[in-house]
Amino acid sequence: MSNDLIPRQARHALARVSQAFPVIALTGPRQSGKTTLARSSFPDKPYRTLEDPETRQLAMADPKAFLAQFPDGAVLDEIQRLPELLSYLQGVVDNQRRMGLFVITGSQQFGLLQSITQTLAGRVGLVELLQLSLAEIASRQRINKDQLNTLMFTGAYPALYDPLRAGALQPGDWYRAYVSTYVERDVRQVLGVRDLATFERFVLMCASRSSQLLNLQALAADCGISASSARQWLSVLEASYLVRLLQPWHENFGKRLVKMPKLYFLDTGLLCWLLRVESPTALATHAMRGPIFETWVMTETLKHRLNQGLAADIYFWRDNHGVEIDLLYPHLDQLFPVEIKSGTTFSSDWLKACQRFAHFAGERSGPATVVFGGESSFETQGTRVMSWLGFSSTTG
């Protein structure tokens, strides 16, 4: 691995999966580092990208001959550009019966995961790679207590931490190009959106709702579109790894529960750019700082689990009286509640939601955690109070 590359935690999950399946599917957002991780993890395998028109044409014209070039397997990038190749890949791996033969990557889930799991059932191991985690960023630069706003404002796409562009690449410039190149091109192409202004408004309205309950009817009304269009557009944003819908945990413990999901963006830098936050200093006093911090903690939790190769079993819990647990993850027969507070000074009031949940859930409730924007970590009244600085390495 090049000394310029930030070591990705998911490489261990990737190596483990490659010993158990003939095909490894590495999926995630565009520009999250999938190609770099795949090539650095399997340096001896030939590399081809189906984004290249000539390569794609060769594979389309004669799929069997194309795959026959790689008797020891290959890294096939952007497989979503030619999903028909998966059927031919099935025949190759069935004949070879070797583990870790092909590595395929994909940036969009528009039916891609379904195609992969159906066509290559029992033959493919899945690894999801999101943007850089805090621990990965900290492996290359010192993180101190004053950098939270900068980290949230910058976001976690690897390009923004490239030492070759240090100081030259501004987050705003990068996100402007990212949205123009990928969001507008890819998403609009799939949806067939003709009214760009309305679609842009939809994305902005989604950004203003990050970490909030998703009322699809209200979102559609605010954008002047039908609820069915809003549902379709949102599903494509989710398939593009731009947003994630966090589902409510189903056990009610005798309470009436909210059934709506919560909407989260998967990168706070992109979220800040969409919300027109101009700098880390502006973020410090921004009205959306609390929701942005909650978004950041959720994505860190998700990255930690996915990087270990674990299922993304993260939920929230909220009853119709407003008692809410921001994050809830099951482990064995217990449920572990996490409260998220952006403040820097601890308040005992922050413990109330977890205490009420423990009362409702009884023995089902595991030890609670409160994650906050301060620098110290400690335990009080049976609850772990975790600084944002150490939270990502202890979740899940």
Where are these regions (language model features)?
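Hydrophobic anchor at the beta1->P-loop junction of P-loop NTPases
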Residues: 26
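N-terminal pre-Walker A segment at the start of P-loop NTPase domains
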Residues: 1-15
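Domain-level recognition of nuclease-like catalytic cores that cleave nucleotide substrates
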Residues: 130, 373-396
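Hydrophobic positions on the alpha1 helix immediately C-terminal to the Walker A/P-loop
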Residues: 37
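Conserved catalytic/switch belt of AAA+ P-loop NTPases
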Residues: 86-110, 118
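Conserved lysine of the Walker
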Residues: 34
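Accessory nucleic acid-recognition modules appended to NTPase machines
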Residues: 171-335
